[in-house]
């Protein structure tokens, strides 16, 4: 669903497409998009990568550690976070993790959401 046609819309999670890293693409407009990380399993952080988009997120359940350049933030239920565009970062999943993120510009367009090399 995209805002480009001037219509309001809805994306049901059961029909949302899934990205290469396990994210579910939710509602998206021309300037912002939402995605869901649902029950992501425990994992060590991947190599840090910088993205062209800004990310804000909210933890629904589970725990993760966000490493961004010289910072480490522990995230748990009810926490929210911000990763500015261009900041190198990674997530270490400490406990099965569910979170909702919004990205601007939309991460799922123009190959911006590809897994880090």
Can you describe what each PLM-predicted range is?
Residues 1-36, 40, 46-47, 116-117:
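A short, N-terminal "cap"/entry segment at the start of jelly-roll beta-barrel domains
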Residues 108-117:
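Short, charged, intrinsically disordered terminal tails
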Residues 30, 43, 79, 87, ...:
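Surface-exposed loop/turn positions
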Residues 30, 67-71, 94:
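Short strand-coil-strand connectors
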Residues 63-65, 72, 88, 98:
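Structural motif
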Residues 39, 51-66:
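Short, conserved beta-strand element in jelly-roll/cupin
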Residues 85-109:
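Ligand-binding loop in jelly-roll beta-barrel domains
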Residues 70-85:
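Short acidic-glycine-tyrosine-enriched beta hairpin
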């Amino acid at each position: 669903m995209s805002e480009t046609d001037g219509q309001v819309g809805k994306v049901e999670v059961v029909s949302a497409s899934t990205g290469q890293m396990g994210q579910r693409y939710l509602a998206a407009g021309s300037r912002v998009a939402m995605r869901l990380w649902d029950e992501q399993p425990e994992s060590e952080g991947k190599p840090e990568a910088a993205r062209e988009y800004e990310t804000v997120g909210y933890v629904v359940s589970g725990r993760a550690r966000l490493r961004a350049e010289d910072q480490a933030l522990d995230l748990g239920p009810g926490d929210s976070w911000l990763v500015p565009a261009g900041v190198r970062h990674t997530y270490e999943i400490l406990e099965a993790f569910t979170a909702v993120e919004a990205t601007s510009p939309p991460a799922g367009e123009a190959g911006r959401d590809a897994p880090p090399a």
